[in-house]
């Protein structure tokens, strides 16, 4: 507590996708700046921020759930929290929203993660709900290509975006018209943001709303500033600027297999696209690295299914892949799912794999 800066603010937990976790200190002023930049973006696409109804299905303890409420507070807009149970029952969700006083009158804006979008798209009432929205910000994880194609076919106003706890949420967003025209990625930086790439391809961000510092869960007494001497923060995400922002995956998630650098997150997206094209009943795929005496590291695939026949089809689908990108093991894991924020808790599933190996030893 003594290390916290003076003045009002919040301490918000970040991380989880690569096994790490830390808490970031964000002054209230930084959250205000973030809300102002997002309002500027909305105005640029013809939406009056003050007129919006912000629907929020994300936890308030995370920046992705905190910021819709904070934006509404700054803009004088409406805010409605959506309980987790509603997001899993699209018929009840649609009925609930139809009962809101401003539903159908004010432009409804929703923040989602890809997992939530997929669940809604799988149900007619979920599709009906999504089609009533003015704007759908989608972030927290990569948007799989099949999901994007499905949203475009339904003419859903998706706005893929990128941000983090460290940046007080959104720093780049793709307008819905460009998304519907087929443009990939997360669009251009917001008005108060600069983006660049480090020599190794890592995305770096400079903005006046970067967190003042953070603590790691395993070193709570150590305060870590985020900025370098020139004000840049290294995100740890592999990216391209072409010119819009394209996120390839976590640099710290890359593995080295047989002399090749492999990004499991990219391969997971390819696998899910192949699974959808083949109409295979798989809820998710997660690739984990294990040590290998010959290759250095090899991939093990956890597959969200209970059908052994699916594994045979997956092996056949990936047979043409380069050896470094091809999993050496395929394991059924019916309970496989990301967190409520759509992020993979890879350390949790590594522990699951260790327990499985120990039981089979």
Name every feature range the model reports, one short phrase each.
Residues 26-41, 53-119, 159:
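AMP-binding/adenylate-forming
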Residues 189, 199-230, 250, 260-262:
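Conserved ATP/PPi-binding loop(s) of AMP-dependent carboxylate-activating enzymes
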């Amino acid at each position: 507590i003594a290390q916290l800066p003076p003045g009002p603010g919040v301490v918000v937990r970040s991380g989880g996708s690569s096994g790490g976790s830390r808490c970031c200190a964000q002054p209230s002023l930084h959250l205000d700046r973030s809300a102002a930049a997002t309002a500027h973006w909305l105005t640029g696409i013809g939406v009056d921020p003050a007129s919006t109804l912000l629907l929020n299905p994300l936890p308030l303890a995370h920046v992705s759930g905190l910021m819709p409420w904070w934006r509404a507070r700054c803009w004088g807009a409406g805010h409605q929290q959506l309980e987790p149970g509603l997001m899993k029952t699209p018929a009840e969700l649609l009925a609930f929203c139809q009962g809101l006083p401003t539903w159908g009158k004010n432009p409804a804006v929703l923040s989602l993660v890809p997992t939530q979008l997929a669940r809604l798209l799988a149900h007619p009432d979920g599709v009906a709900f999504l089609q009533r929205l003015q704007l759908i910000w989608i972030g927290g994880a990569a948007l799989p290509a099949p999901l994007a194609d499905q949203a475009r076919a339904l003419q859903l106003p998706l706005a893929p975006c990128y941000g983090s706890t460290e940046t007080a949420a959104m720093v780049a967003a793709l307008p819905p018209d460009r998304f519907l025209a087929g443009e990939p990625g997360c669009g251009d930086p917001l008005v108060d943001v600069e983006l660049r790439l480090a020599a190794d391809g890592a995305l770096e961000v400079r903005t006046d709303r970067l967190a003042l510092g953070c603590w790691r869960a395993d070193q709570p007494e150590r305060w870590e500033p985020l900025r370098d001497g020139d004000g840049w923060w290294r995100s740890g995400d592999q990216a391209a600027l072409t010119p819009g922002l394209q996120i390839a995956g976590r640099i710290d998630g890359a593995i080295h297999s047989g002399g090749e650098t492999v990004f499991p997150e990219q391969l997971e997206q390819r696998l899910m696209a192949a699974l959808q094209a083949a109409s295979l009943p798989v809820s998710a795929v997660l690739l984990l690295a294990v040590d290998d005496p010959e290759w250095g590291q090899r991939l093990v695939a956890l597959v969200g299914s209970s059908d052994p026949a699916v594994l045979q089809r997956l092996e056949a689908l990936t047979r043409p892949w380069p050896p470094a990108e091809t999993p050496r093991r395929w394991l059924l894991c019916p309970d496989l799912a990301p967190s409520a924020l759509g992020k993979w808790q890879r350390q949790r599933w590594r522990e699951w794999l260790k327990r499985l190996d120990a039981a089979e030893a």
